[in-house]
Amino acid sequence: MNILKISKQTLRNNIKIIREYIGNAKMCFPVKANAYGHGIEDIVENTHDLVDFFAVANSLEAFRVTAVAKNPVLVFGVIYYEYIEKMISENIRVSIQDYEDIEKLEQIAKELDKKVYAHININTGMNRMGVDYNDACRTIQRAYESDWLILEGVYSHLACADNRDHPTNIKQKNRFDSIVKFTKGLSQDIICHLSNSYGFLGQKGICYDMVRPGILSYGFLPEFYVDRVIREIKPIARLLSKVVKIITLQEGEGVGYSLIYRGFEDEQLAVIPIGYGDGFPRELGDRGFVNINDVMYPMAGRMSMDGLTVSLGINEYDVKVGDTVELISAIPRNRNSAFSIAKQTNTIEYDIMSTLNDRIIRKII
């Protein structure tokens, strides 16, 4: 059985640290992609009293949040109109991505005789989604004056927040500042928000009314220097499995698909029942590490869909069937932390955690 063990205490402590850091700004906690792989329901249930909003990517994720908490939920993605009636009935916040969305939402709201809560996404430079910057004020004005929309927020997203010295950050901030000025001229109550984790840590003065710290809440820090208080944030999860078999190789024998790993005489291997079918990175095969009884062991051979093997050498530490295997550590400096795994596989921690699928059990401890 493979288990992602999540520390409730660490999770809640991370959020408290962030709240202290952002001062009076509201906190919108992103729980998209199954709470970055940690499990939406468990994460929401254990944090709803600490945050102001939750944020997700689509309608189906939003419904999972509203099933366990009463906090406002913002959907970042496009509006799927097949779900819009349920979204409106549950007061889920939609993101207006272009001017035409307003008329569509008004028509549906009239039919339901219920107003729609909306945030307007403005494209200030990421050039992916959102209302064009040059059309922002017209769209904001139109939504604000609508009898059927409650314009709750206006937001944008930084394209290069992970590089705090990138000139695009200043360009986007300046554009957003002009939008904030226009918006606040309509109403001081409209929530303006721009920053994700890297945004408010790397750039001063861009917390605005609300921040959206996703990866930071789960315990992953940017590599650039951050405040000493933020350094107290820690990863909240460990991925664990069990040794299910010990095998002994003779010299020249191989293991796994294509037998690319060749053992030495009397080398012992431990078989671990987790593979890329569980969302664990296949690229780790033959180069990753796992922790068994506080000793690091290298993976041996190709990872399969349902399993991997690690070399125990001559097994001088007496690893046995049933011993716990730590595949992802909550200690960032360890060779099997999400940070280290991301470096080994040329990706980011978000990817490592969010691809862990439902074959892995989530357990809050």
Swiss-Prot record:
Query: What cofactor(s) does the depicted protein rely on?
Result: pyridoxal 5'-phosphate
Q: In which pathway does it act?
A: Amino-acid biosynthesis; D-alanine biosynthesis; D-alanine from L-alanine: step 1/1
Query: Where, per the database record, does this protein carry N6-(pyridoxal phosphate)lysine?
Result: 32
Active site (catalytic residues): 32, 257
What are the GO MF terms of this UniProt record? alanine racemase activity; pyridoxal phosphate binding
Q: Which UniProt keywords apply?
A: Isomerase, Pyridoxal phosphate
Q: What is its EC number?
A: 5.1.1.1
Q: Which CDD domains match?
A: PLPDE_III_AR
Catalytic activity from the UniProt record? L-alanine = D-alanine
Q: Binding positions for substrate?
A: 128, 305
EC class: isomerase
The Gene Ontology CC terms held by the record are:
cytosol
GO biological process, any: D-alanine biosynthetic process
**Record-linked InterPro entries:** Ala_racemase, Ala_racemase/Decarboxylase_C, Ala_racemase_C, Ala_racemase_N, PLP-binding_barrel
Spell out the NCBIfam families in the cross-references. alr
Q: Which family does it belong to?
A: Belongs to the alanine racemase family.
Biological role:
Catalyzes the interconversion of L-alanine and D-alanine. May also act on other amino acids.
Name this polypeptide is given? Alanine racemase
Give the classification, highest ranks: Bacteria, Pseudomonadati, Pseudomonadota, Gammaproteobacteria, Thiotrichales
> Quick one: which gene encodes this?
alr
